[in-house]
Amino acid sequence: MSGAPSSGQFINGNNNTPSTIYGVNQDYLTIRKLDVEDGEMFSDEDIKSSAKVCVVGKTVVDNLFPDESDPVGKVIRFNTIPFRIVGVLKSKGYNSMGMDQDDLVLAPYSAVMKRILAITYVQSISCSALTEDLTDKATEEITSILRSQHKLKDATDDFEGDEDDFNIGVVV
């Protein structure tokens, strides 16, 4: 699961850098093919308690800790909110569109929703089908689940039905 990202300023002492914080759960690492190189991913308990902990990408580490090699255990601030670093992601470099995949911060989705976005609902979900062939089936199942959760009426012979109030994007 991933929540909506929020961009802002990350601060460590006199060092600061603009970046994006993503509210996620542990499955996000698998879905996005990310690995924790140092430290660890935050726990289920961190999610349940909306803990102010995070896992950071190498670009964020380089910008906030230019003279230190191990930021695990250190506290950084997102705008004014402190987050303790529990892990550092293995570097992925730039993607084919020229975006720095190491310029990110991951935190428990519950903490981002509560402490940053001040919302009580999930804005975004990331999923991964086991194989490319299962993508359509997964999309259909996700659509069915979301329509049910959002209490949207299906079309019948004499009723048009409710439009989806969500979007599903597919990346292969």
Model region roles, listed by residue range:
Residues M1-F42, I168:
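Short amphipathic beta-strand/extended segments in non-transmembrane regions
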Residues G3-S7, I47, S126, D162-D165, ...:
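Short linear capping/connector segments at secondary-structure termini
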Residues Q9, G73-R77, N167:
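Residue-level detector of beta-strand face positions
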Residues I11-G13, S96-G98, V172:
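Short, well-ordered secondary-structure micro-motifs
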Residues N15, S50, D103, D162-D164:
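Exposed loop/turn and edge beta-strand positions of beta-sandwich/beta-sheet ligand-binding modules
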Residues T17, Y121-I125, D164:
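Short amphipathic alpha-helical segments
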Residues Y22, Q26-F42, A51-A155:
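Mid-to-C-terminal secondary-structure elements
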Residues I142, A155-V172:
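Peri-transmembrane interface segments
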